[in-house]
């Protein structure tokens, strides 16, 4: 009789532990699943390619080459950012440059142009205060009783007439000056009226002065004696 070989204990365990063979996965024909499967496959290929082909280590460059490369990288990195900053600085400095050139041109041309004669400034005339009829009557009435006002009286009068103290003070000063001038003119008129001396013209006055001088020093013709001579007529 044929003997069936008995399985060994290790082999039996291995055969018993082997998982069942998985069935073939079902493929979906939806567009989303097809695109997703293609992207996953492409990503898996690239990752496996990277793992197989490691990137070569960069060779050490000399200091000069490194500085040049760094400068080029800085220029490339700061190029688009520096462009608007340079445009802003140019826009800010452009008016200042034009202003400086304009000032220089004006200084150069100012010496060539003839200077116009400067007209002397006329002194500004002080505006006169316009008094109303009622204010003038009250001021005249106060002036007829009192020619000079104290500070409290002037303030009280200015408050009643709705004027400033300076206006009241100036009005009284002008009124006193006008009164004195009238008095002087009237006194001179009285002197001319009551004067007894006749009014002489300039020629008459000169003739009268000569006659008075001649009469004050009379002249008597006679001969003086010379030696033993005696006057002939006396």
UniProtKB/Swiss-Prot annotation:
How would you summarize the oligomeric state and partners of this protein? Answer: Interacts with serum response factor (SRF). Interacts with SPDEF. Interacts with WDR77. Interacts with TOPORS which polyubiquitinates NKX3-1 and induces its proteasomal degradation. Interacts with FEM1B.
What family is this? Belongs to the NK-3 homeobox family.
| Underlying gene | NKX3-1
Q: Which organism is it from?
A: Homo sapiens (Human)
Supply the PANTHER family for this chain. HOMEOBOX PROTEIN NKX, HOMEOBOX PROTEIN NKX-3.1
Composition bias type Basic and acidic residues, residue spans: 1-14
What's the protein here called?
Answer: Homeobox protein Nkx-3.1
Per UniProt, the keywords (alphabetical) are: DNA-binding, Homeobox, Nucleus, Repressor, Transcription, Transcription regulation, Tumor suppressor, Ubl conjugation
Residues the UniProt record assigns to the DNA-binding region sit at 124-183
Region described as Disordered? 1-131
* Subcellular location, principal: nucleus
Q: Where, by tissue, is this protein expressed?
A: Highly expressed in the prostate and, at a lower level, in the testis.
């Amino acid at each position: 009789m044929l003997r069936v070989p008995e399985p060994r204990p290790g082999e039996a365990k291995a055969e018993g532990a082997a998982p069942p063979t998985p069935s073939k996965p079902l493929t979906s024909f939806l567009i989303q699943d097809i695109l997703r499967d293609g992207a996953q496959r492409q990503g898996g290929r690239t990752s496996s390619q990277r793992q197989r082909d490691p990137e070569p280590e960069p060779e050490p460059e000399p200091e000069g080459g490194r500085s040049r490369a760094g400068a080029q990288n800085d220029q490339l990195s700061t190029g688009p950012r520096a462009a608007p900053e340079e445009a802003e600085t140019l826009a800010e400095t452009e008016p200042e440059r034009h202003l400086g050139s304009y000032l220089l041109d004006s200084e150069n041309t100012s010496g060539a142009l003839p200077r116009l004669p400067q007209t002397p400034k006329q002194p500004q005339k002080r505006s006169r205060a316009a008094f109303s009829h009622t204010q003038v009557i009250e001021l005249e009435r106060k002036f007829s009783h009192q020619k000079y006002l104290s500070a409290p009286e002037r303030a009280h009068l200015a408050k009643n007439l709705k004027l400033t103290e300076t206006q009241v003070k100036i009005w009284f000063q002008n009124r006193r000056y006008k009164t004195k001038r009238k008095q002087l003119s009237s006194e001179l008129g009285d002197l001319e009226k009551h004067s007894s001396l006749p009014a002489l013209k300039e020629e008459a006055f000169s003739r009268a002065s000569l006659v008075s001088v001649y009469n004050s020093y009379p002249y008597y013709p006679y001969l003086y004696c010379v030696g033993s001579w005696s006057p002939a007529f006396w």
